[in-house]
Amino acid sequence: NSNSTFEYLDYELIKKNPKIICGYSDITSLTNIITEKTGLITFSGTNFKTIATDETDFSYKEALNRFVDGSLKFGPENEEYITIQDGTAKGELIGGNLSLIRGMVVGKYSIDFTDKILFLEELGLETDPAGISNHLYYMKQNGVFKKIKGLWIGNYEHESGITLEKIIMDVLDGEYKFPIIKSNNFGHIERKTVIPIGTKAEIDTEEDVKIRLIENCVQKGRFFLDSI
Protein backbone atom coordinates (compact mmCIF):
# COMPACT_ATOMS: atom_id res chain seq x y z
CA ASN A 1 0.00 0.00 0.00
CA SER A 2 1.14 3.54 -0.70
CA ASN A 3 0.94 4.46 3.00
CA SER A 4 4.28 2.70 3.42
CA THR A 5 5.88 5.70 1.68
CA PHE A 6 4.49 8.41 3.97
CA GLU A 7 7.49 8.80 6.28
CA TYR A 8 9.89 9.01 3.34
CA LEU A 9 8.12 11.80 1.44
CA ASP A 10 9.45 15.36 1.52
CA TYR A 11 6.17 17.25 1.66
CA GLU A 12 7.81 20.69 1.45
CA LEU A 13 9.66 19.65 -1.71
CA ILE A 14 6.43 18.30 -3.19
CA LYS A 15 4.61 21.53 -2.33
CA LYS A 16 7.24 23.62 -4.10
CA ASN A 17 7.09 21.45 -7.24
CA PRO A 18 3.37 20.89 -7.99
CA LYS A 19 2.54 18.24 -10.58
CA ILE A 20 -0.40 15.86 -11.20
CA ILE A 21 -0.82 12.55 -9.40
CA CYS A 22 -3.83 10.44 -10.29
CA GLY A 23 -4.80 6.91 -9.33
CA TYR A 24 -7.27 4.79 -7.40
CA SER A 25 -7.35 1.78 -5.07
CA ASP A 26 -4.02 1.61 -3.17
CA ILE A 27 -3.09 5.09 -4.42
CA THR A 28 -5.93 6.51 -2.27
CA SER A 29 -3.59 6.93 0.70
CA LEU A 30 -0.95 8.76 -1.32
CA THR A 31 -3.29 11.24 -2.99
CA ASN A 32 -5.10 12.13 0.21
CA ILE A 33 -1.99 12.54 2.37
CA ILE A 34 -0.31 14.78 -0.21
CA THR A 35 -3.39 17.00 -0.32
CA GLU A 36 -3.58 17.00 3.49
CA LYS A 37 0.09 17.82 4.07
CA THR A 38 0.66 20.28 1.21
CA GLY A 39 -2.69 21.76 0.21
CA LEU A 40 -2.08 20.65 -3.38
CA ILE A 41 -4.86 19.13 -5.43
CA THR A 42 -4.46 15.43 -6.30
CA PHE A 43 -6.80 13.21 -8.27
CA SER A 44 -8.74 10.00 -7.77
CA GLY A 45 -9.33 8.29 -11.09
CA THR A 46 -7.77 6.77 -14.13
CA ASN A 47 -4.09 5.94 -14.63
CA PHE A 48 -1.92 5.32 -17.68
CA LYS A 49 -2.65 1.59 -17.62
CA THR A 50 -6.39 2.25 -17.62
CA ILE A 51 -6.08 4.68 -20.51
CA ALA A 52 -4.02 2.17 -22.50
CA THR A 53 -6.35 -0.79 -21.94
CA ASP A 54 -9.75 0.98 -22.06
CA GLU A 55 -11.54 -0.26 -25.19
CA THR A 56 -13.53 2.98 -25.25
CA ASP A 57 -12.01 6.46 -25.31
CA PHE A 58 -13.73 7.48 -22.06
CA SER A 59 -10.63 7.35 -19.84
CA TYR A 60 -8.62 9.45 -22.29
CA LYS A 61 -11.36 12.05 -22.68
CA GLU A 62 -11.94 12.19 -18.93
CA ALA A 63 -8.25 12.87 -18.29
CA LEU A 64 -8.24 15.67 -20.87
CA ASN A 65 -11.43 17.17 -19.48
CA ARG A 66 -10.03 17.35 -15.97
CA PHE A 67 -6.30 17.99 -16.42
CA VAL A 68 -6.38 20.26 -19.48
CA ASP A 69 -9.81 21.85 -19.72
CA GLY A 70 -10.59 21.94 -16.00
CA SER A 71 -14.15 20.72 -16.57
CA LEU A 72 -16.53 21.23 -13.65
CA LYS A 73 -18.62 18.20 -14.66
CA PHE A 74 -18.21 14.56 -13.70
CA GLY A 75 -18.45 12.09 -16.60
CA PRO A 76 -19.96 10.34 -18.37
CA GLU A 77 -22.65 12.81 -19.46
CA ASN A 78 -25.46 10.26 -19.18
CA GLU A 79 -24.41 8.99 -15.74
CA GLU A 80 -27.33 8.39 -13.39
CA TYR A 81 -27.02 9.92 -9.92
CA ILE A 82 -29.33 8.48 -7.29
CA THR A 83 -30.40 10.25 -4.11
CA ILE A 84 -30.20 8.19 -0.93
CA GLN A 85 -30.74 11.06 1.49
CA ASP A 86 -31.96 14.54 0.47
CA GLY A 87 -30.11 17.76 1.03
CA THR A 88 -27.49 20.21 -0.17
CA ALA A 89 -23.86 20.57 0.84
CA LYS A 90 -20.68 22.37 -0.15
CA GLY A 91 -17.19 21.30 0.78
CA GLU A 92 -13.81 20.09 -0.44
CA LEU A 93 -13.70 16.56 -1.83
CA ILE A 94 -11.71 13.85 -0.06
CA GLY A 95 -11.90 10.08 -0.31
CA GLY A 96 -11.37 7.03 -2.48
CA ASN A 97 -11.08 3.41 -1.44
CA LEU A 98 -12.82 2.83 1.91
CA SER A 99 -10.23 0.42 3.33
CA LEU A 100 -7.46 2.98 2.81
CA ILE A 101 -9.49 5.95 4.07
CA ARG A 102 -10.26 4.03 7.26
CA GLY A 103 -6.52 3.85 7.92
CA MET A 104 -6.26 7.65 7.79
CA VAL A 105 -8.84 8.45 10.47
CA VAL A 106 -6.42 8.90 13.39
CA GLY A 107 -2.67 9.11 13.91
CA LYS A 108 0.28 11.05 12.55
CA TYR A 109 -0.87 10.59 8.97
CA SER A 110 -4.58 11.20 9.48
CA ILE A 111 -6.67 13.49 7.28
CA ASP A 112 -9.09 16.21 8.37
CA PHE A 113 -12.70 15.30 7.54
CA THR A 114 -14.17 18.58 8.83
CA ASP A 115 -16.69 20.14 6.42
CA LYS A 116 -15.65 17.81 3.60
CA ILE A 117 -17.65 15.91 0.99
CA LEU A 118 -16.46 12.32 1.36
CA PHE A 119 -16.52 9.92 -1.60
CA LEU A 120 -16.12 6.19 -0.96
CA GLU A 121 -15.84 3.02 -3.04
CA GLU A 122 -14.80 -0.51 -2.13
CA LEU A 123 -13.85 -3.72 -3.91
CA GLY A 124 -13.87 -5.91 -0.80
CA LEU A 125 -17.60 -6.62 -0.92
CA GLU A 126 -16.71 -9.77 -2.85
CA THR A 127 -14.76 -11.31 0.00
CA ASP A 128 -15.30 -9.43 3.24
CA PRO A 129 -18.57 -7.51 3.69
CA ALA A 130 -18.23 -7.86 7.48
CA GLY A 131 -14.81 -6.24 7.30
CA ILE A 132 -16.27 -3.34 5.31
CA SER A 133 -18.87 -2.87 8.02
CA ASN A 134 -16.12 -2.86 10.65
CA HIS A 135 -14.23 -0.14 8.74
CA LEU A 136 -17.35 2.02 8.68
CA TYR A 137 -18.09 1.49 12.37
CA TYR A 138 -14.50 2.49 13.16
CA MET A 139 -14.99 5.71 11.21
CA LYS A 140 -18.32 6.33 12.94
CA GLN A 141 -16.89 5.72 16.40
CA ASN A 142 -14.07 8.15 15.68
CA GLY A 143 -16.43 10.93 14.67
CA VAL A 144 -15.90 11.02 10.92
CA PHE A 145 -19.59 11.18 10.04
CA LYS A 146 -20.19 13.98 12.55
CA LYS A 147 -17.64 16.11 10.68
CA ILE A 148 -18.47 15.67 6.99
CA LYS A 149 -20.97 17.75 5.00
CA GLY A 150 -21.98 15.11 2.45
CA LEU A 151 -21.36 11.56 1.23
CA TRP A 152 -20.94 10.24 -2.33
CA ILE A 153 -20.99 6.45 -2.72
CA GLY A 154 -19.55 4.47 -5.61
CA ASN A 155 -22.15 1.96 -6.73
CA TYR A 156 -20.07 -1.22 -6.57
CA GLU A 157 -22.30 -4.28 -6.17
CA HIS A 158 -21.37 -7.91 -5.53
CA GLU A 159 -23.27 -10.59 -7.46
CA SER A 160 -24.90 -11.65 -4.19
CA GLY A 161 -26.75 -8.33 -4.17
CA ILE A 162 -24.72 -6.83 -1.32
CA THR A 163 -24.09 -3.14 -1.96
CA LEU A 164 -21.77 -0.65 -0.32
CA GLU A 165 -24.78 1.64 -0.02
CA LYS A 166 -26.69 -0.87 2.12
CA ILE A 167 -23.76 -1.47 4.47
CA ILE A 168 -23.17 2.26 4.88
CA MET A 169 -26.82 3.01 5.59
CA ASP A 170 -26.97 0.20 8.16
CA VAL A 171 -23.98 1.72 9.95
CA LEU A 172 -25.25 5.31 9.78
CA ASP A 173 -28.65 4.14 11.08
CA GLY A 174 -30.41 7.42 10.32
CA GLU A 175 -28.27 9.39 12.78
CA TYR A 176 -26.94 11.97 10.30
CA LYS A 177 -28.73 14.56 8.15
CA PHE A 178 -26.14 15.26 5.45
CA PRO A 179 -27.04 14.52 1.80
CA ILE A 180 -26.04 11.12 0.42
CA ILE A 181 -25.88 10.22 -3.27
CA LYS A 182 -24.53 7.30 -5.29
CA SER A 183 -23.33 6.76 -8.83
CA ASN A 184 -21.47 4.15 -10.85
CA ASN A 185 -18.68 6.28 -12.31
CA PHE A 186 -15.74 5.89 -9.93
CA GLY A 187 -13.82 3.14 -8.18
CA HIS A 188 -13.01 -0.38 -9.37
CA ILE A 189 -14.90 -0.10 -12.63
CA GLU A 190 -13.78 0.33 -16.23
CA ARG A 191 -14.97 3.90 -16.75
CA LYS A 192 -13.63 6.15 -14.01
CA THR A 193 -14.43 9.82 -13.69
CA VAL A 194 -11.52 11.88 -12.38
CA ILE A 195 -12.27 13.41 -8.96
CA PRO A 196 -10.00 16.27 -7.80
CA ILE A 197 -9.21 15.84 -4.10
CA GLY A 198 -9.08 19.17 -2.29
CA THR A 199 -11.36 20.95 -4.76
CA LYS A 200 -14.68 22.43 -3.66
CA ALA A 201 -17.84 20.70 -4.83
CA GLU A 202 -21.57 20.98 -4.24
CA ILE A 203 -24.20 18.27 -3.73
CA ASP A 204 -27.79 19.22 -4.56
CA THR A 205 -30.17 16.28 -4.60
CA GLU A 206 -32.84 18.33 -6.40
CA GLU A 207 -30.67 18.47 -9.53
CA ASP A 208 -30.41 15.74 -12.20
CA VAL A 209 -26.61 15.80 -11.90
CA LYS A 210 -26.45 15.81 -8.14
CA ILE A 211 -22.80 16.73 -7.65
CA ARG A 212 -20.62 19.25 -9.45
CA LEU A 213 -17.39 21.12 -8.92
CA ILE A 214 -17.72 24.77 -7.94
CA GLU A 215 -14.10 25.73 -8.56
CA ASN A 216 -11.70 24.92 -11.38
CA CYS A 217 -8.86 22.70 -10.18
CA VAL A 218 -6.65 23.69 -13.13
CA GLN A 219 -7.09 27.43 -12.59
CA LYS A 220 -6.25 26.92 -8.93
CA GLY A 221 -2.83 25.82 -10.13
CA ARG A 222 -1.93 23.78 -7.08
CA PHE A 223 -1.89 20.17 -8.24
CA PHE A 224 0.71 17.41 -8.31
CA LEU A 225 1.72 15.84 -11.93
CA ASP A 226 2.77 12.28 -12.33
CA SER A 227 0.13 9.69 -13.10
CA ILE A 228 0.64 6.31 -11.41
What are these regions (language model features)?
Residues 28-39, 189-197:
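Glycine-rich, charge-decorated loop segments at or immediately adjacent to ligand/cofactor-binding or catalytic sites
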Residues 109-164:
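Internal helical hairpin/lid segments
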Residues 26, 101, 151, 198-201:
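Buried hydrophobic positions in well-ordered alpha/beta secondary-structure cores of metabolic enzymes
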Residues 9-34, 41-47, 177-180:
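Short, acidic/small-residue loops that bind anionic groups at enzyme active sites
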Residues 155-228:
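ATP/nucleoside-binding phosphotransfer catalytic cores, i.e., glycine-rich phosphate-binding loops
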Residues 39-102, 106:
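Conserved anion/nucleotide-ligand pocket segment
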Residues 19-20, 40-43, 91-92, 116-118, ...:
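Structural motif
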Residues 1-8:
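Long, hydrophobic/aromatic-enriched structural stretches that serve as scaffold segments
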